[in-house]
Amino acid sequence: MLNKNIGYISPDYLYKYNSPINTEAILKIRQERQAKLFKFSHEKYYKAVQTIADIQSNFFDCSSAVIKVGHPEEISPGQKQRLYHCLQTFCPWKKGPFELFGVNIDAEWRSDWKWDRILPHISSIKNRKVADIGCHNGYFMFRMVDQQPELVIGFEPYSKHFWNFQLIQNIVKQKMLAFELLGVEHIHYYPQFFDTIFCLGILYHHTDPIGLLRKMRQALGPKGEVIIDCQGIPGDLPVALTPQKRYAQARGIWFLPTQSCLENWIGRAGFSDINCFFAAPLSVEEQRRTIWANIDSLPEFLDPHNPSLTVEGYPAPWRYYAIARK
C-alpha cells in the first residue's frame, strides 16, 4: 500500500498473525520513531527519496551479488540525473553492491561475500518468518527475496537507513519485506514468532551480548535457527577484548570475542547445535574505500607497519560466523 509521506509500505503483518506479538508495545515505538523520520536533521533523506517517486520499474533481480533494479533505458536523462543525486545523498553506502537503472553502487562492504558464505549453511527460509537484526539499507533483506520467505522483518533504528531502504522498496514493492525502526533490544516483543533470525555484525556493539542472545532465543519458535556474524579477535582461549576507548578507530565497540568465547556466549544463552562455520581475518578487499563510500576504511584502521594490529595496537579484526538452534 502507499503512504503519501513515505511511499510503498507492505501490508501490516501485525494484523495477519494470530500470535503473542506485543502489538501494543510495537505500535507505540513505531508511532514515536516514524514521527522522527521527518525531523529537520533527516530532511535531506526523505526529500531525496521524494524526488524519484516517479521512477518505477518491474525489473528486480536479487539472485546474484549485485542487486539490480530497473534498466537504464527505462528512465529519461532528467530522471537519471535526479536518481544519481538521490543516490549520492546516501553516501557513504556501507552495504551493497547495488545497480539501479544502470548506476553501479560499489559499497564499502562486499555484503555479497557474507551472504555467499552464509547461504549454504542455513536451513531453507522458504515460507518462513525471518528477522534481519541491524538490517541497515536492506541489502540482505532484498537478497532473501530470492529464497521466497513468507515474511522478513528488518530491525534498524536509524532513520537514514530507513530512507535508504525505502528508496529501493518504493520501486521494487516487495510485500514480504517489512522495515521496523526497532533495535535488537526489542526482539523479545515477538515471542516464539520467527523461524530464522539473522544477527549480522551487531553483538560486539552492545554491552550485554549474552542478554541479547537470550532475547533472540525467546523470539524463535521451536527448533528455530539463529545465524550470528560477529567481529572478534584471534586466539584459542575463550576470552573477549574490551578496548579502552576506540577499536579500529571506531567507538561503540564493547566485546570482541575469540571463536570459543563466541560459542560460549551462544551456548550460555541457551542455544544448542552450535556450529562456527567461518573464521578468518577481515580482509581489505572485503571492507575498503570506494567512490560511493569515500571514507576511511579497513586499510586506514590497521597499523601500516603491521597489518595484524589495529592503529591502536589491538589484534586486527577477525570475523566469526556461527549457526545454532533453539
Swiss-Prot record:
Catalytic activity, reaction form: carboxy-S-adenosyl-L-methionine + 5-hydroxyuridine(34) in tRNA = 5-carboxymethoxyuridine(34) in tRNA + S-adenosyl-L-homocysteine + H(+)
One annotated GO biological process: tRNA wobble uridine modification
Binding site for carboxy-S-adenosyl-L-methionine: 95, 109, 114, 134, 184-185, 204, 319
Membership in a protein family: Belongs to the class I-like SAM-binding methyltransferase superfamily. CmoB family.
Coiled-coil stretches noted in the UniProt entry, renumbered to this chain: none
Enzyme Commission designation: 2.5.1.-
UniProt keywords, alphabetically: Transferase, tRNA processing
Pfam family, one: Methyltransf_9
Record bears the keyword Transferase: yes
Species for this entry: Trichodesmium erythraeum (strain IMS101)
Class of the enzyme per the UniProt entry, highest EC level: transferase
NCBIfam families per record: PRK15068.1, tRNA 5-methoxyuridine(34)/uridine 5-oxyacetic acid(34) synthase CmoB
Protein name: tRNA U34 carboxymethyltransferase
GO molecular function, a single term: transferase activity, transferring alkyl or aryl (other than methyl) groups
InterPro entries with a match to the protein in the record: CmoB (IPR010017), Mo5U34_MeTrfas-like (IPR027555), SAM-dependent_MTases_sf (IPR029063)
Protein purpose: Catalyzes carboxymethyl transfer from carboxy-S-adenosyl-L-methionine (Cx-SAM) to 5-hydroxyuridine (ho5U) to form 5-carboxymethoxyuridine (cmo5U) at position 34 in tRNAs.
